[in-house]
Amino acid sequence: MKRLDLILNGKGGVGKSFFAVNLVQFLKDRGIAHVAIDSDNENSTLKRFHPDTRFLDLGNRRELDGIFGALEKSNLVVMDCRAASTDLFIDYFAEIDLSAVLSELGATLTLVMPVNHESDSVDQIQRLTDQFGKKCNYVVVRNASHSDSFALFESSEVRAQLKDKLGGREISMTRLQDWLVEALNAENLTITAATKHPAFNLLDRQRLQTWQRKLYAEIESAADLLLPTK
């Protein structure tokens, strides 16, 4: 079964692109064939770190069709969706009858939804689950980059709904030291590349490798919802 992973949360700054960069690197490190798509015309973070990433203009419906053109040719498509794009995808998927298209392609959709300590990020997840219900799979990425408290999400109705009714999965993305994030951005390096780069000393390379191992283990724990299935 083919897989379309949309990394989506209408709120900006919740870690969509950072997770996307590391998920795509996971796929490369594991030798998993895929197509990566960036849709952020202001930042294009995914394409900056992975130059082989395709770019699609969300304002152009013909370009949006390229998501499914890619899925016709690949078993896995990963798309980093820019902030404030929830309404656009809801409208577009209704226009094309998403369920019918996925059925024709032999594919499933997974919404990968980063969440942090802010209520807006939780509200956006509620909005997506209200809209799509059981039509797709859900993976929530608990992003601790700014706070390790997820009290609002943990006490929310949507978390209970995801766990009890929708088969959702939660994975964690722990905080990476600020100076390491800044250095990765300054050098335009993925963590895998940084562990072999002279700009990073021994201890920082160790920090990066430890962080990456933890995230990769989290991704693998949700592989049945993130990767193609036989």
Q: Which ranges hold each PLM region?
A:
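Beta-strand-loop-alpha "switch" segments that mediate conformational coupling across diverse proteins
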Residues: 145-146, 151-153, 160-210
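Glycine-rich phosphate-binding P-loop
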Residues: 7-21
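Conserved beta-strand segments of the P-loop GTPase G domain that flank and frequently precede/overlap
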Residues: 37, 111-116, 140-144
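Short beta-strand-centered segment that lines the nucleotide-binding/catalytic pocket of NTP-utilizing
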Residues: 31-44
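P-loop NTPase switch/communication element
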Residues: 42-57
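Conserved C-terminal guanine-recognition region of P-loop GTPase G domains, centered on the G4
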Residues: 99, 119-135
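Inter-motif core of Ras-like GTPase G domains
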Residues: 90-117
